[in-house]
Amino acid sequence: MSTLLGWLGRLWFGSLGTARPDPSTAVAAAGSTDVTSTQDAWAVLSLVNEWVKHSEAKLGVVLAFVGVMAAGLITIAADIPCPSLVILCIEGAAAVLILASAVLASLGLLPRFKGQSEEAQMNPLFYGDVANHFKGKSEEYVTALSGVIGSQDALIRQIARQVHANADVASRKYLWANRSILVGMLGLVCLFVLAAGVALGW
């Protein structure tokens, strides 16, 4: 039982409580980018972006599954003219769990707009920072981006920061997907119990 509870705890809470070091700090401390090329940094960013896409696809599948469960619940409920108190309770539990699963999946799909408030921490490769710091200042953004691109050290540092941010986004999306799946499975159990109750005349 303790093993099961531990697994459910890890599934629900994930590892968001563990602080991750900023990779741009490690790049700055190294003082040289001879080992890591700019192409390698872009490749790592592309890989992390694929993780984000996969997590969003997973959330989309979960939402579709939740929609099917909601349709099933409506169909079963519509076929019961005079439900008993037991059936009503099961229907209510199933509805709450299905709705909660949909909300959890939707939270995972919400985009992240917040950027760095400090100018020194601004990343010209992140759309949130671009929108916050360069709204209506296209020429200033061109200058800032050119300054980053013109320095391999600065470019790799900014790419590393974006990799770090995107990895955090991906892990959070997977966490919300896991939570939605867990709650959705409980809703599915309620649907099976409801169907059995209707068949047995509860």
Curated annotation (Swiss-Prot):
GO terms for biological process: defense response to virus. The keyword Nucleotide-binding applies. GO terms for molecular function: nucleotide binding. It is found in: Cell membrane. It is a multi-pass membrane protein. Pfam families: PycTM (PF18967). The chain crosses the membrane at residues 60-80, 85-105, 181-201. This is Pycsar effector protein PtPycTM.
